């Protein structure tokens, strides 16, 4: 049954009332010895204004979220990497969820993650889920890779120091696909500078890579690679995202480590 719309009406004092809620839309006030009729909000108008304010707040929140994602997630495919889109095939997603749930402690304790495993194991997806969840909470996150960073640094009139500073300013930096970037002396120096700058500022870092833990710890590496990987392993807890890990004992130990950090 449709609600009938009742016309506004005047009371015995000549003040207007809302025909729907019955509350005053006008009231009399005395000022400087004179009586004035002034407007006021009835319940319907208060409710309508509140709903409009809430709508505007939601729209502004969506606008700000879009802006944060546009800056922090340059590749549009990252936008769809969300926990609600997970197919449940890899239980390591629980670590990503716990990381987000305990983000305040993770940030305070400077806890990062090193998500490792072959192509197709979901490590980049897990990192993207963390990024999107924190962005939706209002946090500033940058998810990128060193190939993109190095391209920016070698572009015309690029300010390398400013680019590094911009990356350091993010509460969380996610580096996707570590190891695919070029291995020139310049490139390795800049990779180290970015990582070390966040280390010095005690800001968390999440890294995804196809490299194995043994590769990153190998003493056969040159000095440039050794110091990069050593710094990452200082900052990040290794999590193997593949199936059965050949380094099962070490993986279990690290899993306990990150869980203890997450739970306090």
Where are these regions (language model features)?
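Walker B catalytic acidic pair
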Residues: 177-178
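Short glycine-rich substrate-engagement loop in P-loop NTPases that contacts/grips substrate
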Residues: 93-100, 132-172, 182-189
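Pre-Walker A (pre-P-loop) alpha-helix and adjacent loop at the N terminus of AAA/AAA+ ATPase modules
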Residues: 72-73, 79, 85-113
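Metal- and O2-centered redox machinery and metal/ROS homeostasis
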Residues: 22-25, 93, 107, 241, ...
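Residue-level preference for the first positions of well-ordered beta-strands
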Residues: 110-114, 140-141, 172, 204
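Walker A/P-loop nucleotide-binding motif
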Residues: 108-127
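A short, basic N-terminal segment
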Residues: 1-90, 251-264
């Amino acid at each position: 049954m449709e609600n009938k719309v009742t016309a506004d009406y005047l009371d015995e004092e000549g003040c207007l009332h809302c025909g729907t809620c019955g509350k005053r839309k006008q009231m009399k006030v005395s000022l400087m010895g004179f009586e004035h009729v002034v407007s006021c909000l009835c319940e319907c108008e208060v409710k309508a204004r509140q709903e409009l304010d809430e709508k505007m707040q939601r729209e502004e929140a969506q606008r700000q979220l879009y802006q944060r994602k546009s800056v922090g997630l340059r590749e549009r495919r990252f936008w769809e990497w969300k926990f609600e889109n997970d197919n449940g095939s890899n239980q390591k997603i629980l670590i990503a969820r716990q990381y987000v749930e305990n983000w305040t402690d993770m940030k305070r304790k400077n806890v990062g993650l090193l998500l490792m495993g072959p192509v197709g194991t979901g490590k980049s997806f897990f990192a993207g889920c963390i990024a999107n969840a924190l962005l939706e909470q209002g946090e500033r996150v940058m998810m990128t890779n060193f190939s993109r960073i190095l391209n920016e640094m070698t572009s015309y009139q690029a300010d390398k120091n400013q680019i590094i500073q911009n990356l350091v300013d993010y509460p969380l930096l996610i580096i996707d696909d570590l190891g695919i970037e070029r291995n020139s002396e310049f490139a390795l120096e800049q990779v180290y500078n970015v990582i070390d700058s966040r280390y010095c500022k005690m800001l968390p870092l999440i890294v995804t890579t196809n490299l194995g833990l043994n590769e990153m710890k190998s003493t056969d590496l040159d000095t440039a690679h050794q110091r990069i990987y050593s710094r990452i392993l200082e900052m990040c807890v290794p999590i193997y995202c593949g199936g059965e890990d050949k380094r099962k004992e070490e993986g279990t130990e690290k899993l306990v480590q990150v869980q203890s950090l997450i739970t306090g």
